[in-house]
Amino acid sequence: MSSTIDISLGAPCGAIRAIHGINNSPSIVEAAALPAEKEAFRALRIPRVRHHDAPIENSRYELVDVSRLFPLWRADENDPANYDFRPTDDYFAIARECGADIEFRLGETIEHSTRRYRVMAPEDPAKWARICANVVRHYNEGWADGYHWNIRRWSIWEEPDNIRLLDAPDEDDHGRWGVFESRYLALYEAVSKLLKREFPDILVGGPQTMGASMDKLGCFLSFCKETDSPVDFLAWTCYTGDPEQIVRDVRAVRTLLDGSGFPKADVHLAEWHLGPKCWNTLHVPENREYMSSVHSGAFAAQVLTLLQDEPVDMAYFYGWGIGYWGLWERPFRRPYPVWHAFKAFADMTECTRRLSVECTPAEGVSVLAGEIAEGGKRILVSCYKSAAHVFKLRLPGAAKVSVTALTETGVSNYEIEPSPDGLFHCTGNDGGSAAYLFRT
């Protein structure tokens, strides 16, 4: 049996924040597929993109990772001839053409192999820091036939508590969090201090830990306070089936920053996505179908709605075209269901002001509303693993409402007119997950 949810719009309450960042962007691999991919990416109005695991999305191309920009470790890091920026230049240029700002992740792509090849902790942190400084010079100061792109945000490594992303040859270095304490902290100190000394206007941050562990993040901040290492933003990754978990993490991280003496540092969610049913069976068909289903779309829409009122500065979804983790199914040149949720949220960011909402409380349902410059109203309703509902929208003066519905059966567009009671009635999903965008 369906329950009824009444939705009424109230007074203006600020702006809808475009916090829907993403990991990775349209690929350089196939020129023939690029126009459609760029169009799909541009439609989402992505405010900022960071690039982690980019070589996975650009197979056969050496790009983004520090070991791919500077491939021969024993070479002279001050000689521009020892760098190859070309694939990364082209890759970033596409993202910029699509209107996205860039955060540069200085690090490596994950390695699931038995032996690690690129994620070993740099043997000389000072040299690695100098290499990173030259990367900044290339993109911000024109060094080595480079650019003046003013890339402001630079994150140092990714999940340094994950042995698949930061390893060391000596097992004695493997402490309670892998090599996080024994290797990463010193690396962060070397890189962050050099970058801020040479480029005082950029922002540096880390550590992008697996989850918002207060122990790990607290350890990181304590180390930075003791060593006077700069922290302009604090970041972590989160894969969960509970949207409220992300909200709790954001609040905890903000509180930790303030209590640790970094009140001006921003809060960045470096990676987030609906978590798999089971990490040990990640690649079985059932998991793939779940990760790329309407559940992922409803989850994403709900997270972006809930975070509107939370102290997070950017939330980078993982990712753009990385298989069933992504928004774009590259082999078939078509979007996954979650792309449609991002498109609905992107349409919400066109609103010139946010509107308060009065709504019948319902588990798994969130509502975001706004008004565009011409006066039309927009309402995004996210139903994540919720019961069946009938929505009744109170929209005085509206003659009709256009609906875009993302459900288990796909995406549909239709119009509804007022019922005899003057309200707009919309029968929602029969239970499960869905997302709806209403426009007057």
Identify the function of each model-found stretch.
Residues 1-46:
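Mature N-terminal, pre-catalytic/accessory segment of carbohydrate-active enzymes
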Residues 22, 95, 135, 154, ...:
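Conserved, mostly hydrophobic/aromatic
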Residues 32-33, 179-300, 310:
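Noncatalytic carbohydrate-binding groove/subsite architecture in carbohydrate-active enzymes
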Residues 44-241:
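Substrate-binding cleft and catalytic face of glycoside hydrolase catalytic domains
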Residues 273-368, 376:
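Aromatic/acidic polysaccharide-binding cleft in carbohydrate-active enzymes
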Residues 361-399, 403-410, 432-437:
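Carbohydrate-binding surface patches
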Residues 405-422:
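Solvent-exposed beta-strand/loop surfaces of large extracellular or lumenal domains
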Residues 417-440:
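C-terminal beta-strand-rich structural cap/linker in extracellular carbohydrate-active enzymes
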